[in-house]
Design a protein with these regions (language model features):
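Active-site loop-to-helix "anion-binding N-cap" substructures in soluble metabolic enzymes
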Residues: 1-230
Length: 230
């Protein structure tokens, strides 16, 4: 679980080389109200003391649970953005257990993870639904964080490039070049969630493949401008 100190250290590391970065901490199903309160207190203090956001263009986001989004938004200062973990592409309806893009937008929460491997598997989120959600968020001046990644079987079969390219093409189908630049892409190899970790050369090769796919779909400039996270 990400601590306030670990996120602060990540900010230090990336901003030492390049100001124009994005860091998002996914809390998953962690942190109750008191935990959020304690995290926000320490995090706000660290950022204020070192004046990170005054010196950098780094975008910092946290993705709390559905219940944690509003208290996190109220407690976290210094322009830290709150990111939803999942949203539905319909404004409202008979979708038990979901929250809509429009509902979070009403509370000025304008970012959401889309297609995280856990929502793909546990909620049976399809490529078509991911595409619809990305489009409706972009239409409403919101920022989708597209999550992509391959399984251990796909990685061992050397199908990483093919898998992530297909995920990107399906997710951004019908999305213009200008809108594609607003999408954040997060690479999360499913096989590396937990005990295993992806090496720097593996991550770099996948990021290169992501930009190659975007260049083929759009152009080199679009591929350069899209933020890619690991």
């Amino acid at each position: 679980v990400c601590t306030a100190q670990s996120v602060k250290e990540a900010i230090e590391k990336v901003t030492s080389k390049n100001n124009n970065k994005v860091i998002i901490a996914n809390w998953k199903m962690n942190k109750k109200f008191e935990d959020i309160k304690a995290y926000a207190y320490v995090f706000n203090k660290l950022l204020k003391r070192d004046k990170f956001l005054a010196k950098t263009k780094t975008l910092i986001g946290v993705a709390p649970t559905m219940l944690g989004m509003l208290p996190a938004a109220a407690m976290l200062k210094n322009n830290v953005v709150v990111v939803a973990q999942h949203v539905h592409y319909e404004k409202s309806g008979a979708f038990t257990g979901n929250v809509s893009y429009d509902q979070i937008h009403e509370y000025n929460i304008n970012y959401s993870l889309i297609g995280h491997s856990e929502t793909r598997s546990m909620m049976n989120v399809t490529e078509g639904q991911i595409n619809k959600t990305i489009k409706v968020m972009l239409e409403n001046q919101m920022v989708p964080v597209l999550c992509i990644g391959e399984t251990l079987e796909q990685y061992e079969a050397k199908q990483t490039g093919k898998t992530i390219s297909l995920q990107i093409m399906n997710a951004l189908k019908g999305v213009s070049s200008e809108n594609a630049k607003k999408v954040i892409i997060a690479y999360e190899p499913i096989w590396a969630i937990g005990a295993q970790t992806a090496t720097v050369p593996v991550i770099k090769s996948v990021i290169d493949k992501i930009r190659e796919c975007l260049s083929d779909m759009y152009d080199e400039q679009t591929a350069k401008e899209v933020h890619v996270l690991y």
